Amino acid sequence: MAANCTSSWSLGESCNRPGLELPRSMASSETQLGNHDVDPEISHVNFRMFSCPKESDPIQALRKLTELCHLWLRPDLHTKEQILDMLVMEQFMISMPQELQVLVMMNGVQSCKDLEDLLRNNRRPKKWSVVTFHGKEYIVQDSDIEMAEAPSSVRDDLKDVSSQRASSVNQMRPGEGQAHRELQILPRVPALSRRQGEDFLLHKSIDVTGDPKSLRPKQTLEKDLKENREENPGLTSPEPQLPKSPTDLVRAKEGKDPPKIASVENVDADTPSACVVEREASTHSGNRGDALNLSSPKRSKPDASSISQEEPQGEATPVGNRESPGQAGMNSIHSPGPASPVSHPDGQEAKALPPFACDVCEKRFTCNSKLVIHKRSHTGERLFQCNLCGKRFMQLISLQFHQRTHTGERPYTCDVCQKQFTQKSYLKCHKRSHTGEKPFECKDCKKVFTYRGSLKEHQRIHSGEKPYKCSKCPRAFSRLKLLRRHQKTHPEATSQ
């Protein structure tokens, strides 16, 4: 998957595809989760080439950008590790020498681990040569070129390069490998190869001369957009104002220091994977009216930590600094909060409730994907099935954790007692047994507990709730283990 996503950077073929248009409307989360026909490579190109006019609503532009990122990375289908591999592989293809880019393309590398193993073996691309054409050097795939059939001018160029092939490839640097386009197509040269007939088209050639800055997304995409605007009528908006580095994605244009972005590794195991990159990808039809009223003169910019960390239910979305109305929402990878905060005389800002509410139990959530997954607890829908035992799950990540029980994989190890766990959240809870930490406190009696589940069971003592009912008699219990112990007292259960 990572190699497929990075190929749009390395080959530059997707940028010339006809019909690439930005999404015109914001699709619902259910549409995004079920739309498996969208080519991730096309979404990747649309995401990188996205731009919006100055007159457009920055909030709507930010939502479109969020949708494109969601369709490219597909956090509802991929794990955090796979998404990280996609991003790292993309940057690798941008910043590394062309020799290594060819190595990735030839071997079909799927992950960073595979790429690391490939580089450790000191493998180098084969069947590729450096060709000089009209004063520029290109890395070209060999195709049984017969020098006798080539024109004298081209033959002399090829001979000059062939004598220095090994040294030329080894001396390439990341900054020496791109002109205004990362990947260029040579013009036709007649009678150069029998295999290609009278026309020789270097359709996968890589220019190895140019400006080091051309490797960065901004300059490359701006020039690609200018050259392809006539060929691609779907991209009619002005040139994208893309950042020079990933840190500029979260830096405010006023010159303020960028907020600290929470790592994807900090996402809890029970957090829906779709919320890693989707903050507010879309709304239900009932919430669409509220979403359209977000174009206020001043809009809030949420805290960056809300991208990857699940917020407690019922609490307000963190709110950061505001931006001027003329600024486009292009410097953030998450969507804004549901509404701008209302200023009060005392200087405090009102806390807004999470915008997405369940119509069954009225539970509220910070992003729509959490609400979609929560509704499955009411409908009983379990889309993901284990192919070994047939057990079904509501979330893909739950299925992936379950499959570790079959494979025996326990990637998380306690550094104190060396006990291993299948999930990071289990390890986090286990470490409290060594530290003695009890972060969960009962509001009624101030008793503290190590685990959240223990607190919930304890709170039923105060509320009198007994959700576990016996099917053989009217008795009910506050704990599941008490119900199971009671069921053994019935004759039918004992005989079985």
From Swiss-Prot:
Changing E146Q: In a colorectal cancer sample; somatic mutation. Residues 44-126 form the SCAN box domain. Keywords: DNA-binding, Isopeptide bond, Metal-binding, Nucleus, Repeat, Transcription, Transcription regulation, Ubl conjugation, Zinc, Zinc-finger. It is found in: Nucleus. InterPro entries: SCAN_dom, SCAN_sf, Zinc_finger, Znf_C2H2_sf, Znf_C2H2_type. Its main location: nucleus. Residues 152-183, 203-348 are annotated as: Disordered. PROSITE patterns: SCAN_BOX, ZINC_FINGER_C2H2_1, ZINC_FINGER_C2H2_2. The keyword Cytoplasm does not apply. There is a cross-link at K159 (Glycyl lysine isopeptide (Lys-Gly) (interchain with G-Cter in SUMO2)). Residues 219-232, 250-259 have a biased composition (Basic and acidic residues). Disulfide bonds: none annotated. This is Zinc finger and SCAN domain-containing protein 5A. The gene is ZSCAN5A.
